[in-house]
Amino acid sequence: MNTHIYADIITIGDEILYGQITDTNSQWISAELDKLGIKTRRKSSVSDKADEILQMLREASQRSSIVILTGGLGPTNDDITKKTLCTYFKTELVWNDAVLAHLENLFFIRGRVMNALNKEQALIPSNCEVLTNRHGTAPGMWFDVNGVVYISLPGVPFEMKGILSDVGFDKLKHRFQTPHIIHRVIKTSGVGETTLAELIADWEAALPPYMGLAYLPSAGEVKLRLTGSGDNLEQLQAEIQQQVDSVLPSIEKYVYGFDADTLEYTVGQLLKKQNKTIATAESCTGGYLAHLLTSVAGASAYYSGSVVAYQNKIKTDFLDVPAEVLSKYGAVSEETVKIMAAEVRKKFGASIGVSASGIAGPDGGTEEKPVGTIWIAYADESKVVTLKLQLSNIRENNIRMTALAILNLVRRQLKEVK
């Protein structure tokens, strides 16, 4: 079994280089290849010029055993990929009866007349194997030359994905006898990457050689991605789960979910399970917390509503924060968020009220309260819990990190995690 299989991905098109469209093809392809145990060595974008495409092909074939191209297979004059591949492989375009029959049937079903340009999509390099495109007109093409597999695909994302999902990935798996790859993601919040690494250092050091751990930090959370590879899928799945089970006791209070779980989903499930409701009072987050909570289907079962109290007048008029509290302590204070959380809970008749007030940035800070100073609060029928955050001067990150910090505070209170 070859454990070192590498791929190059080449996206073709002036529109990519000019920033007119975003290349999402290479991102998706590399993620899917990773699931097969194939590592992407390089991603490249190139213009619709034959000499540049040829240079890319020569370079890619020297470092990778798989070269995947997307784009340039359409019927217009600037679609030159097929002709360029003929130059590269020293071959010529020939008519393919199966592709032509597919085109004729497709145009008949759509009630359209096939013109000469459309028909030319049935011209393909003589040395390729056709990868049927059930989703459009341009066929995919597979070349296996001198130990390197080249796959040429349409640039239209849903057509490219369709061809690879229908036939391409299976052919790659068979051709290279790739191992099974399993990823398990442990999602944490409320803990930094370095602290997490210290907590699990012994466990990580003891991982077997066919498993690896990646730390994936982002605003408000750190993901731990455990990856294993092997020939026996069931055995590998069991061993991955054993490793997850063995590390959880060390970090359990920070773990909110696995794989596709989100913090807002986890909190929603806890609220539903405990038959509780929540209301939100937001200042610096401007409704982002409400957005996260309501992005989960079925949130009406536990989400009562929100007050976005951006101005002090709204804090006073709608949340009964006394003017003297605002005058003495300021909007960004423990005293203010405590009242906001308690009052929003009371006004909406919810089990829980939460709040946030702070200086999201990039300006507005003072020496006493610099940019990134944020207070959050949690209130239920028996207590009010507050937490001070000291974040950065990046507004978007501060808004998201504050909302996630509130959700994590709710999670820990509901699970009674200290």
UniProtKB/Swiss-Prot annotation:
CDD domains: cinA (cd00885)
One Pfam family of this chain: MoCF_biosynth
SMART domains linked: MoCF_biosynth
Highest taxon of source: Bacteria
Protein family per UniProt: Belongs to the CinA family.
Protein name as annotated: CinA-like protein
Species for this entry: Cytophaga hutchinsonii (strain ATCC 33406 / DSM 1761 / CIP 103989 / NBRC 15051 / NCIMB 9469 / D465)
